């Protein structure tokens, strides 16, 4: 059975969805005012992998990841660039989908935007006001935190301790330092919407509560996001949602660890970030994904050139093993007798993979299992007697397990040296038979694979570009 580490209880728990066989999952997406950096890609990859594994285990997953497309940073950036917020956010939403798509992150089933959810947000706040959990103050609306008695349960903090660390400045409009804004009164030259409290726009926390409810209902199976969102964002989501809906908001809370540079969190505010599209100019997308999966999603990762090179070498080992099996399959004639011992090893490897992923989506252990598969594949590829059926089983298991992790092998295939030599011999034979069309076809095929041919007096020489 799948066990997930629930941040709400701080322990691993058996995963039991609300509706048998179905999973509702909400992930806090980006505020779209800039390109995403490598740290932003961590939750995208981590929770895409959770979704993939749940699907692999037979669940029907409805996956929602939002775009925050109205925010102080968005407004400020749009003003600096002299463009409207819609143009800005559309550009960065497209960029987000392109960058995460390059990392083989599947699009969500629903990508809601705040600006498309305004009616539901306003109704949500109105309901909180009716219940006595919200109050209006000079056009702003705040959540009355002291009325929600279990506030702090996600971050394991008491209201008293939180209040002791807060203060209300003179002239501030809140009743309590812990109260947070649900609706902001309109300011000149900012996007605004009509509401019962006058023109304005929503606060950040209420947006996710409303979008989750609209697309997944009052109680969802899994809510996920970065560790930095646990407090106050997720804490406030719980307070709003449970106060409004009189129901538990989410049964499982998953939080991914940070990506650090020089042991400090990668972030735009610190200026120590690396944009994904810049990183991918130097790092293969599958290597970057493999790098992140090599560490458990809850643990921090230190990003460095040395560790990226280690990930590249590890991914290369797995690819080469896959290609060795492909080549042996291509030159193996006849059916042959299937290897029972190899098939037993494959069954054991698959069982170990599932055991690792059942344990709170432990991709670090799952990657170790891939190395076990690569080792056994290399041994079998060199065996004197092999069977096509067994070779095909090895390839199938590679595709199955890497597919669960969102890693692609077949699409990245490079020609092996032996395959290149074989094609060159075929080209030589075609030229000798004056079949120049076929010879040119082979030359073009090799060129597409970045293989350059040079005809010399001693024969054809080739090199990789």
UniProtKB/Swiss-Prot annotation:
Chief location bin: cytoplasm
Keyword Phosphoprotein listed: no
Cellular localisation: Cytoplasm
Positions of ATP binding: 268
Catalysed reactions listed for this entry: tRNA(Cys) + L-cysteine + ATP = L-cysteinyl-tRNA(Cys) + AMP + diphosphate
Record-linked InterPro entries: Cys-tRNA-ligase, Cys-tRNA-synt_Ia_DALR, Cys-tRNA/MSH_ligase, Rossmann-like_a/b/a_fold, tRNA-synt_1_cat_dom, tRNAsynth_Ia_anticodon-bd
Cofactor annotation comment: Binds 1 zinc ion per subunit.
Entry EC no(s): 6.1.1.16
Aminoacyl-tRNA synthetase in keyword set: yes
Short motif 'KMSKS' region, span: 265-269
Entry's Gene Ontology molecular function annotations: ATP binding; cysteine-tRNA ligase activity; zinc ion binding
Any Pfam family the entry gives: tRNA-synt_1e
Cofactor: Zn(2+)
Domain of life per record: Bacteria
EC class (word): ligase
An individual GO BP term: cysteinyl-tRNA aminoacylation
Short motif ('HIGH' region): ranges: 30-40
Gene Ontology CC: cytosol
Gene3D superfamilies given in the database record: Cysteine-tRNA ligase, C-terminal anti-codon recognition domain, HUPs
Subunit structure, interactors included: Monomer.
NCBIfam families linked to this entry: cysS
Name of the protein described by the UniProt record: Cysteine--tRNA ligase
Organism from which the protein derives: Exiguobacterium sp. (strain ATCC BAA-1283 / AT1b)
Upper classification of the organism: Bacteria, Bacillati, Bacillota, Bacilli, Bacillales
């Amino acid at each position: 059975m799948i066990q997930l580490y629930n941040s709400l209880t701080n322990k691993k728990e058996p995963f039991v969805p609300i509706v048998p066989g179905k999973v509702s999952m909400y992930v806090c997406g980006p505020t779209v005012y800039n390109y995403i950096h490598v740290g932003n890609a961590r939750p995208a990859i981590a929770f895409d992998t959770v979704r993939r594994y749940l699907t692999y285990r037979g669940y029907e997953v409805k996956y929602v990841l939002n775009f925050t497309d109205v925010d102080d940073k968005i407004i400020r950036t749009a003003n600096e660039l002299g463009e409207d917020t819609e143009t800005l956010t559309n550009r960065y939403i497209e960029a987000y989908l392109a960058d995460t798509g390059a990392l083989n992150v599947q699009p969500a089933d629903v990508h809601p935007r705040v600006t498309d959810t305004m009616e539901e947000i306003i109704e949500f706040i109105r309901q909180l006001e009716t219940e006595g959990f919200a109050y209006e103050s000079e056009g702003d609306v705040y959540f009355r935190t002291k009325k929600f008695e279990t506030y702090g349960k996600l971050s394991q903090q008491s209201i008293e301790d939180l209040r002791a660390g807060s203060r209300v400045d003179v002239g501030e409009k809140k009743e309590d330092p812990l109260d947070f804004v649900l609706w902001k009164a309109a300011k000149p030259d900012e996007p605004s919407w009509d509401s019962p409290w006058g023109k304005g726009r929503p606060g950040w926390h209420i947006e996710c509560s409303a979008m989750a409810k609209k697309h997944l209902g009052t109680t969802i199976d899994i809510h996920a996001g970065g560790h930095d969102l646990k407090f106050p964002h997720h804490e406030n989501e719980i307070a709003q949602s449970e106060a409004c809906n009189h129901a538990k908001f989410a049964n499982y809370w998953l939080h991914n660890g940070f990506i650090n540079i020089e042991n400090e969190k990668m972030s735009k505010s610190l200026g120590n970030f690396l944009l994904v599209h810049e990183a991918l100019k130097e790092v293969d997308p599958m290597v970057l994904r493999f790098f992140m999966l090599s560490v458990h999603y809850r643990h921090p990762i230190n990003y460095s050139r040395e560790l990226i090179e280690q990930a590249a070498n590890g991914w290369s080992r797995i690819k080469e093993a896959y290609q060795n099996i492909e080549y042996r399959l291509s030159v193996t004639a006849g059916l042959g007798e299937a290897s029972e011992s190899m098939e037993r090893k494959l069954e054991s490897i698959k069982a170990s993979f599932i055991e690792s992923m059942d344990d709170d989506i432990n991709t670090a252990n799952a990657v170790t299992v891939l190395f076990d598969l690569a080792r056994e594949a290399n041994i079998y590829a060199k065996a004197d007697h092999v069977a096509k059926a067994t070779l095909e089983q090895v390839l199938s298991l590679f595709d199955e397990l890497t597919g669960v992790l969102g890693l692609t092998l077949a699409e990245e295939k490079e020609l092996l040296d032996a395959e290149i030599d074989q094609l060159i011999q075929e080209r030589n034979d075609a030229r000798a038979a004056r079949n120049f069309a076929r010879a040119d076809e082979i030359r073009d095929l090799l060129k597409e694979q970045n293989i350059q041919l040079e005809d010399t007096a001693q024969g054809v020489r080739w090199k990789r570009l």
